[in-house]
From Swiss-Prot:
Residues 99-231 are annotated as: RU B. InterPro entries: AtzD/Barbiturase, AtzD/Barbiturase_RUA, AtzD/Barbiturase_RUB, AtzD/Barbiturase_RUC. Cyclic amide hydrolase of unknown substrate specificity. Catalyzes the hydrolytic ring-opening of a cyclic amide. Does not act on cyanuric acid nor barbituric acid. This is Cyclic amide hydrolase.
């Protein structure tokens, strides 16, 4: 993508492969917006897809989840990734396969006062279960990445609610926390009985190792995209995941590679990499040290941008192994992987 509003590459790629927007299941982007919920890539894609879908642009997101991540720090490549249905595919499965499968859904419209609360956890958990069913995934162990875009209500919408008085950044953090805990509950990573209002942003032991949650002002519901492997899928792709213990941990991505059958050959180059896509969630700025050494991500003059700097760190670590800087890198890792680290998922053929 040459800019956040650049949809030409996606439109050309769809046309070249004989697809149209009606075949699109989900869109993900890395854009050079500010990352604070004010990006406009989703609006550009909505206008591009609306004519083919036969609906006004404002309704496109109800048909096609759009998960746009702003902030291309370091060497992160701005790009768009599109998931499509291919009814003409010649791929076959013998039922034993475990090919890549995705399921998409949305929650009902969320009351702004429920955002960042246990009520939102329940709504997201139900949506994750529905998306798993849509993907043909029966076992939670076969789920390797759950992308969620939650609402990011304005301060005015939160008056007299449980988040009243919080600044905009804190509201976004609570929304992401609720989304992540919803995934954790749905997949059995956390017991629902442990979810109370006072654990949000306070108990890092309550977390999901496959969730990747972002928040946006454009949503009034939570969009959910579950990615995993299903024995009913004929896809030649597989997905696996790992956990990054800190920002310079190579073992998380190596675990993800092994999970898709790649046991050797790293570090790869752009010409040799077997990796099709990587999804990273950074929680690098969740602590003030790395392996016992103090760092100043949160305390020097760039402290307000610690989330952005953390993304650059973890991106460099993973890109140096997979051999490609084009990958999704999302900050705001509340309850997503261990503080100071993050999560990674890899799709390979």
């Amino acid at each position: 993508m040459t800019s956040p509003e650049d949809t030409a590459g996606v439109e050309a790629a769809l046309a070249a492969e004989g697809f149209s927007p009606t075949d699109v299941r989900a869109v993900m982007c890395m854009t050079e917006s500010d990352g604070f919920g004010r990006g406009y890539a989703s609006l550009a894609f909505a206008h591009a897809f609306a004519p083919a879908l036969g609906c006004p642009p404002e309704d496109v997101a109800q048909q096609i989840p759009m998960i746009m991540i702003g902030g291309c720090s370091g060497l992160v490549t701005p790009y768009a990734a599109v998931f499509v249905d291919d009814p003409a595919s010649s791929w076959v499965t013998d039922g034993s396969g475990g090919g890549l499968s995705i399921g998409v859904t949305t929650t009902a419209t969320l009351n702004p006062l429920d955002v960042g609360t246990p009520a939102m956890v329940d709504a997201v958990a139900d949506a994750v279960r529905s998306a798993m069913a849509a993907a043909g995934i029966d076992k939670v162990a076969d789920v390797h990445n759950v992308q969620i875009k939650t609402p990011w209500p304005s301060s005015a919408a939160l008056l007299d609610g449980p988040l009243s008085g919080l600044d905009a950044g804190s509201v976004g953090a609570m929304a992401r926390a609720a989304g992540a805990l919803g995934v954790a509950v749905a997949l059995g990573e956390v017991s629902r009985a442990d979810i109370t209002a006072d654990v949000f942003l306070r108990d890092p032991n309550l977390r999901s190792d496959v969730a990747s949650v972002s928040a946006g002002t454009e949503r009034v519901d939570a969009a959910v995209l579950v990615m995993g492997n299903s024995p009913t899928s004929a896809s030649p792709y597989r997905i696996g995941h790992g956990v990054l213990r800190d920002g310079i941990d190579p073992h998380g991505v190596l675990d993800a590679l092994r999970a898709v059958g790649i046991d050797s050959g790293w570090p790869f180059t752009a010409d040799t990499t077997p990796v099709e896509h990587v999804f990273l969630k950074s929680a690098v700025d969740g602590t003030d040290e790395c392996r016992g050494r103090r760092h100043v991500l949160r305390t020097d003059y760039l402290g307000p941008y610690s989330w952005l700097l953390g993304k650059a760190v973890v991106h460099a670590t993973v890109a140096s192994i997979v051999g490609d800087p084009m990958m999704q890198v999302s900050g705001g890792g509340e309850h997503q992987g261990p503080p100071g680290g993050g999560t990674v998922a890899v799709i390979a053929r």
